């Protein structure tokens, strides 16, 4: 499988690698690929590497990008409704009977989220516990 990371705001390894201040809003969402291989530490690769290694064709890479950016639009909107910024997320794609498919989950656990108002980093499990506690106390 090909791991895909979509970033909206600079954070984590992106900030460290490129010297961009954490929290910098990117001019447009970026996409990064990594070769899903635990023994190698899932190294970053580019489109050419993916094609050369037989991980994806040019057309499949375009399909993956289209799907990844569409997922980004949906997740950004969904999390914004919960007062959360979608900083970045990772998903994996692979082939099944010749078709490009999502090969892993899309979940809050694969997303980096910050509070819209405070930029506080949100750990989704803790956030959900707090949310449920607040809503249970309203009854």
Predicted regions and their residues:
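Acidic/polar, glycine-anchored loop/turn motif associated with catalytic or activation segments
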Residues: 1-88, 94-139
């Amino acid at each position: 499988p090909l791991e895909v990371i979509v970033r909206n705001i600079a954070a984590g390894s992106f900030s460290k690698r490129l010297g961009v201040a954490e929290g910098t809003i990117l001019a447009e969402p970026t996409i990064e690929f990594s070769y899903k291989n635990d023994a190698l530490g899932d190294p970053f690769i580019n489109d050419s590497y993916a094609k050369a290694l037989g991980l994806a064709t040019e057309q499949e890479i375009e399909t993956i990008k289209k799907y990844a950016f569409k997922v980004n639009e949906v997740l950004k909107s969904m999390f914004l409704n919960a007062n959360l910024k979608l900083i970045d997320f990772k998903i994996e794609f692979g082939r099944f009977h010749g078709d490009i498919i999502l090969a892993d989950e899309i979940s809050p656990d694969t997303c980096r989220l910050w509070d819209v108002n405070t930029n506080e980093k949100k750990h989704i499990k803790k956030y959900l516990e707090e949310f449920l506690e607040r809503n249970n106390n309203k009854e």
